[in-house]
């Protein structure tokens, strides 16, 4: 029953993403490049197993026939590597609060990409949200003299990754496998370079730490698979509302469990961002109710 509920799958996938900081507490101070290398190396056998389990029979010839998607996978995996390295750095260096901010503002970056590249028109609620988010980031710049760089990098990179994936025609497991294969040479070079330079920790780590390195693959991929199943069986409104669960959990973990520094400046900054997002959430709910009412009257929703 759980697997048939799109809403529950969406909530579960974002819940898993939200609690990932707990996992990365087991790998404190590890270099993001080493985590990237290990994640790619272990993702490939995991994805091959998933494809076998799902009886995915996409052949090399079919993949090669769509060269546009093949090249887009190269672009998307490059962007995702930046996003993931930034994310893992924040997880392993007590910067979960900034990661939380990054994911709170990701939807606003997605809106901007739609406006710039797809010529979409901003709704009044989206305009208001952007103003409040800019005010929140600007307030930190004014008070601290610097921007929340990690948050901005994570938010923009993840939004760009999602934007690029819209144009990839492969199914999820095929595209994820191709993305991993594109990064495989980089992962192998990184592994040997880090080990030879003495900066790598995998070969000298204890058994528990090695297992944690291996688990970076399922910790990254399983929520994504649940999320994809959710998208196919629930409304975009539900997805749009559920996406704020992840940064909310990360925020609560950072402040109340990890005791990260949360002063008045960050309080004002986050409050402005939350206020802006509230306009987007209310707009989503209003749009959903409006379409539901139209459907009840036999009018085609827009």
Question: Can you describe what each PLM-predicted range is?
Answer:
Residues 101-105, 172-182, 221-256:
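Helix-helix packing/entry segments at the starts of transmembrane helices
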